[in-house]
Amino acid sequence: KDVSISEIRLQQLPDNTSKEEKEKIIIENLAYGNDVKGLNEHLKMGLKEYVNSDQYKKYLDTISKFHNYSRRNIDLIHQQKPDATLIAGAKKWNESFERYINKGEKGFTIYAPSEYKVKDLNGDFVLDKDGKVKTNIRFIPVKVFDVSQTNGKELSLNSVELENNVENYVDIYKALKEIADKDNIKIVFVDKELMPRAYGSYTPAKNTIELRKGMGQGDTLSTLIHELAHAKYQSKIITTEEYALNELHAGSIAYVTSKHLGLDTSKQSFGYLNSYMKDRKDFTDLDRVIDKIHSDAKDLINKIDTTLEKVKSKEITKDKFQSKIERAIEKQKEKVSQKTQEVMPEKKFPRQPAMKN
């Protein structure tokens, strides 16, 4: 049996080498060796770890931070640098952020788009109808570094995380309701007596989400996101076998989206994942569901972010308009006051007689 370069390098590593460092070596050799099949198989092997609820939540954390990246790149980031928050190549860090790689830091591998000129079988460039050389996009392995591996100019980032307070609760709820309204999904609140065992439910026949009254703000939003995932991204008719996977799908979207919004996710658990995947040797179902979780969470997060911006801009416009009205009212009051003073004659008091001694 041939021994791969990565196996040789792994054998040379100290015993206390971290799992992430070993992953970097394996992935680097598979990616730069153009072994796409081997890389995909290696990443799928990581699915076995997600049967553990805590490990699965850590993976969802990575999706939350990098929801606009491809599924493959999310897997690569999670395997090599699960605590990453913001990544870029060394050149990008230098030129765009004036930051530099810390001495001794090692990058990790992801895939990035690269433009190339198209050639024919004879090696000549192919021209388009305008006589220009045709170009295409391919994805190549590149080295990136997390912000924690860099130093330099302080970053001024617009954080997407929101504190879970009343003001932001109202904004987020408005955004979610607007998204639901576009699909004619009704949202109603019901008494706890009518929903004693659940926080929420979705009824496909009525296209209605029911939420239990009296929940905390974070629970209300997370439950609404969970039920919205059922309503927007799942089939209206499901089999008993599909139920567990559908709950995993909706629960995962709720976790990823809530995490993105800065809501508390500590109460959320995935115990049913362990029971569903128990004794399974084939992880095809889980792989398929994670693909859907990634694409649907990305879609919902982007919709929420866009709608939140609109909600906030409306409030700013409203505040400006309200201020304008208030200023106009004050000016009007001042004018009325001035006119009143001009119209009213000076009040003269009768002269008091001089006191006699």
Task: Show where each model-derived region lies.
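N-terminal accessory/interface modules of nucleic-acid-binding and processing proteins
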Residues: 1-339, 344-348, 353
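Conserved ATP-binding/catalytic motifs of P-loop helicase motor domains
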Residues: 355-357
